[in-house]
Amino acid sequence: TRRSSDLKAHRQRLKNLKRVESRNQRSIATYVNSLFDQHAKLLVIRLDIGYRKAYYDQLTLDLVTNDLNGYLRRIQNKYPALVGYIWKLEYGVDRRFHTHITFIFNGAIHQRDISLGIALGEVWEDMSDNNGSYFNCQVRREEYREWGTDGIGMVHYSDTTKRINLINALSYLTKLDTQILAVLPAGRRTFGRMERPSRQPRLGRPRLLFCRSD
């Protein structure tokens, strides 16, 4: 029957998505370690971007996707010291479409995470004609410290604990969000990252083997 066929297709889709999730999780540590191969310290900024409630009725997946792609391009053009980013698109009844983004900057160039987070958020508001909203997660760093999960702000190459916290936090972004499946056509991405040129490890800096996400 058609119903059983649809159910089978849904189960296969979930299976495929879980496989992609596992692959993405494994790649996170490799991605972060490759950045530390080239930089002694990284400034990590977490930003949540979305839309104001008055704009919810106008939102479509294509509009949200185009806005996100345009925003990430603008940030790359505006900040040459941006060395990486990872994003995850989510959907909720209360917040509708929203995206969690972790921006990673060369820590030798940028040091002020809170003010930079505000600047990144203001770029989003500006390009969305003030229909967009954002939350700068840097203001919650004290809470993260108390919970033992602080992996944002300045992260030094030698700070094993903070690097593991960073990888764990980024691994969360790869988790399968079942709510968005209802509004997301098969084949559309909910997770992505800034592609980097071929790895060129910094001279004199040994590769790390201890920062893993499993």
What do the predicted segments below correspond to?
Residues F105-S128:
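Helical (often loop-to-helix) elements that flank the catalytic cores of nucleotide-handling enzymes
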Residues T1-S4:
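Short, small-residue-biased leader/transition segments that mark boundaries at the very start
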